[in-house]
Curated annotation (Swiss-Prot):
Reaction catalyzed: D-sedoheptulose 7-phosphate + D-glyceraldehyde 3-phosphate = D-erythrose 4-phosphate + beta-D-fructose 6-phosphate
Family that this chain belongs to: Belongs to the transaldolase family. Type 1 subfamily.
Entries under CDD domains matching the protein: Transaldolase_TalAB
Domain of life: Bacteria
Biological source species: Opitutus terrae (strain DSM 11246 / JCM 15787 / PB90-1)
Location, primary (coarse class): cytoplasm
Subcellular compartments: Cytoplasm
Record GO cellular component, one term: cytoplasm
UniProt key word DNA damage: no
UniProt KW Cytoplasm keyword: yes
This protein's pathway: Carbohydrate degradation; pentose phosphate pathway; D-glyceraldehyde 3-phosphate and beta-D-fructose 6-phosphate from D-ribose 5-phosphate and D-xylulose 5-phosphate (non-oxidative stage): step 2/3
Protein name: Transaldolase
Protein task: Transaldolase is important for the balance of metabolites in the pentose-phosphate pathway.
Quaternary structure note: Homodimer.
C-alpha cells in the first residue's frame, strides 16, 4: 500500500522529473524527465556536470559552432538522464526557432541523429517545441517522420486544440505561470480548486478525453503542491525536485481529481482553428500572449548564456 503522496500519485498519474539533476531523479524514481534551456544552463554551471560540458566541446570539435556544441550538450545530458529513468526524456529545440517551421524541423532531426549516435532510440526522446503556430506545424510533420514531440509554453485552449489536431505525442500545459499572471493582474489569491492554471489543464484534459485525442496531457510549471494534487489523474505531471520532496514527505491521502470516464461524458463542443483563427484567439488572450512571448524570450536568453559559457570554456 503506497504510503506517501508521491507514491499515491504514481498510482494514477505518470510522474516526470522536471530537472537536469541526476541525484534527485535517483531519489524520486520518476518514469520520464523533462529538460529546458534554463535547467541545462543551471546544471552546466555546477561542478558535478562540468565533465559533460568538456565532453561536448571536445567531441563537437574545434570547428563546431557554439550552437552545435549546445546540441551535443543537450543530448549528452539527455543520454545520462536515460540511464536513470526508464522512460523518455524531453529535449528542447532552440527557442530562437520558435517562429521558424523549417528551422525547427531541421534542429529536431539533428537532435534525434545525435541521440541515435549515442545509442539512444528515438522512441525514448520527446522533442520540445514552443506552441506557436509554426511550432505546431513543425511538430505535425515531425510526428509523421516518427519523431515524437512535446509542445511546451502552452498557455491556452486554442494551442491545445491545434496540437491535438496535429496529432502531436504530448503537450505541456503550464500551470504556475498562468497563476503568476493572474495573481499579478488581479492582486487576488486563488484556492487550489479555482487556480486558473489548474482550470486550464482541467479544460484541456476534458476536451481531449471527450473527443478521443491520443495526445498525452502533461501538466507542467507548478508553484505549489496543491496545484499538483488538484490535477491528480492527469496523464502525466512534470514536477520539480523541491515539490517531489514535499509530496514524498507527506502521508495525507491523495484523491483522484481527473477521471477519463467522467471527461468522456462532458458536455463540450468540438472546435477547430485554422491559422487565422488560431492567431486571433491567441491574440485575444492577453495572458497566453504575454506568457508565450515571455517564455520564448527567457529560453532564448538562456541559450545565449549557454553559448557564452561554451565560448568561455573553449578559452
Amino acid at each position: 500500500m503506497p504510503t506517501n503522496q508521491l507514491e499515491q500519485l504514481k498510482q494514477f498519474t505518470t510522474v516526470v522529473a522536471d530537472s537536469s539533476d541526476f541525484d534527485s531523479m535517483k531519489s524520486y524514481q520518476p518514469r520520464d524527465a523533462t529538460t529546458n534551456p534554463s535547467l541545462i544552463l543551471k546544471a552546466a554551471g555546477m561542478p558535478d556536470y562540468g565533465h559533460l560540458v568538456e565532453k561536448a566541446i571536445t567531441d563537437a570539435g574545434s570547428g563546431a559552432s557554439p550552437a552545435a556544441v549546445i546540441d551535443l550538450l543537450l543530448v549528452l545530458f539527455g543520454a545520462e538522464i536515460l540511464k536513470i529513468v526508464p522512460g523518455r526524456v524531453s529535449t528542447e529545440v532552440d527557442a530562437r526557432l520558435s517562429f521558424d517551421r523549417v528551422g525547427s524541423m531541421e534542429k529536431a532531426r539533428t537532435l534525434i541523429a545525435l541521440y541515435e549516435k549515442q545509442g539512444v532510440p528515438r522512441e525514448r526522446i520527446l522533442i520540445k517545441l514552443a506552441s506557436t503556430w509554426e511550432g505546431i506545424r513543425a511538430a505535425e510533420k515531425l510526428q509523421q517522420e516518427g519523431i515524437n514531440c512535446n509542445m511546451t509554453l502552452l498557455f491556452s485552449f486554442p494551442q491545445a486544440v491545434a496540437a491535438a489536431k496535429a496529432k502531436v505525442k504530448l503537450i505541456s500545459p503550464f500551470v504556475g505561470r498562468i497563476l503568476d499572471w493572474y495573481k499579478k493582474s488581479t492582486g487576488q489569491d486563488y484556492a487550489p480548486a479555482d487556480d486558473p492554471g489548474v482550470n486550464s489543464v482541467r479544460e484541456i484534459y476534458t476536451y481531449y478525453k471527450r473527443f478521443g485525442y491520443e495526445t498525452e496531457v502533461m501538466g507542467a510549471s507548478f508553484r505549489n503542491k496543491d496545484e499538483i494534487l488538484e490535477l491528480a489523474g492527469c496523464d502525466l505531471l512534470t514536477i520539480a525536485p523541491k515539490l517531489l520532496g514535499e509530496l514524498a514527505a507527506s502521508t495525507d491521502p491523495v484523491e483522484r481529481k481527473l477521471e477519463p470516464e467522467a471527461a468522456r461524458k462532458a458536455k463540450v463542443k468540438r472546435v477547430s482553428f485554422d491559422e487565422k483563427s488560431f492567431r486571433w484567439a491567441l491574440n485575444e488572450d492577453q495572458m497566453a500572449t504575454e506568457k508565450l512571448s515571455d517564455g520564448i524570450r527567457s529560453f532564448a536568453a538562456d541559450v545565449r548564456k549557454l553559448e557564452q559559457l561554451i565560448q568561455q570554456q573553449r578559452g
